[in-house]
């Protein structure tokens, strides 16, 4: 979630179209240079690493998007809060990050072989080049492997069901952390209150002793 920032001119950013045709298997995401002015129809992740680009371009993330995203007519409406923030990103080793980096770069390299085709054409199911489709399928298999799931990639309901369980586990963990923090805060407050009471009592005792001593003198 922290990757999303409001910047008009980052050094380099990955852009995600807010609306995308329901006919596409993958939302066409891309990188843009700092000279590009991004308008309100795009979300951007400044200085996005290629392994994040790869994860977001995987079928796993797109399956999640198809279930939780809003709609604009029949098109999907991507949201950083609903789709991105609630997606269960896997914990990655450096080796896995490097592998995803390579697969993400492979997708960009294959796209570059079709300079006369824009992303709309490249990601139209009827015109998507076979090498690009294979590059995505290779990425999809690697991402499923990283999640340590024996998913049937033709069955997105199975993928989403597991992602929903991961999401619920994250919520449970977050709630436990919140409860633990609140309990610790209450304990600190109780300790401070006890110390204040002891200080007050000690002061009162001194005052009483002083008063008694004065009375005895009199």
Predicted regions and their residues:
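Functional cleft and adjacent loop/helix regions within the main domain
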Residues: 205, 210
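S-adenosyl-L-methionine
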Residues: 1-198, 217-218
């Amino acid at each position: 979630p922290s990757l999303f920032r409001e910047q008009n001119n980052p050094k380099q950013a990955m852009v995600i179209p807010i609306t995308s045709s329901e006919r596409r298997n993958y939302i066409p995401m891309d990188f843009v240079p700092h000279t590009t002015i991004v308008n309100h129809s795009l979300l951007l992740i400044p200085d996005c690493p290629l392994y994040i680009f790869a994860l977001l371009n995987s079928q796993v993330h797109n399956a999640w998007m198809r279930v939780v995203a809003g709609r604009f007519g029949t098109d999907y409406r991507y949201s950083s809060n609903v789709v991105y923030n609630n997606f269960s990103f896997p914990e990655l080793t450096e080796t896995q990050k490097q592998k995803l980096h390579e697969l993400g770069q492979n997708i960009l390299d294959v796209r570059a072989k079709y300079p006369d085709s824009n992303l709309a054409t490249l990601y139209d199911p009827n015109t998507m080049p076979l090498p690009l489709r294979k590059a995505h399928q290779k990425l999809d298999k690697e991402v499923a492997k990283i999640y340590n799931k024996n998913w049937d990639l033709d069955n997105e309901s199975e993928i989403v069901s597991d992602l929903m369980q991961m999401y619920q586990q994250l919520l449970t963990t977050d709630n436990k952390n919140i409860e633990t923090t609140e309990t610790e805060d209450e304990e600190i407050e109780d300790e401070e209150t006890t110390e204040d009471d002891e200080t007050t009592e000690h002061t009162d005792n001194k005052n009483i002793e002083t008063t008694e001593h004065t009375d005895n003198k009199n």
